[in-house]
Amino acid sequence: MYIHEFTIRNFMIHKATSIQLSPITVLVGPNGGGKSALFDALLNFSMLARGSIRQAFGSYPYSYTATKYRASANIARVGFDVVMSRSREHPEKLHYTINYTQQGVADPGNPTFQIFKESLRDNGTILTPGSGQAL
């Protein structure tokens, strides 16, 4: 898969950040500006895309509590919007959206998550609508 655009919501230092990606993307900024958090978000999304929300959150510093947007304890949902294609040779774009939260005070070894919105769209056609799933 080739990611064209990656939007992060309520993840670490990023309240709402969207970046355009090209074959070579350079991130430049001050210490504490969110460069490493962006890579953590990409890793988190990668684990989600492999099939298990539980894999996306391990022990601290990658626990859900440690990774949700740090400026507000009231924000509970983390989300990603991703525009991607199979490859540069197959440029048809897919749009994937997921918003989720951890439910209650979870057992660190077996947390429970709630997906509020998940969809995969191809040229405006919704391929996989979903929401309200407890995992």
For each predicted feature, which ranges?
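N-terminal pre-Walker A segment at the start of P-loop NTPase domains
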Residues: 1-14
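Solvent-exposed residues in well-ordered beta-strands and their adjoining turns
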Residues: 9, 22, 83-85, 101-103, ...
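Phosphate-binding P-loop
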Residues: 16-22
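Hydrophobic anchor at the beta1->P-loop junction of P-loop NTPases
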Residues: 27
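The conserved Walker
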Residues: 31
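Conserved lysine of the Walker
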Residues: 35
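Conserved P-loop NTP-binding catalytic core
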Residues: 39-106
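Electropositive, glycine-dotted interaction segments
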Residues: 89-135
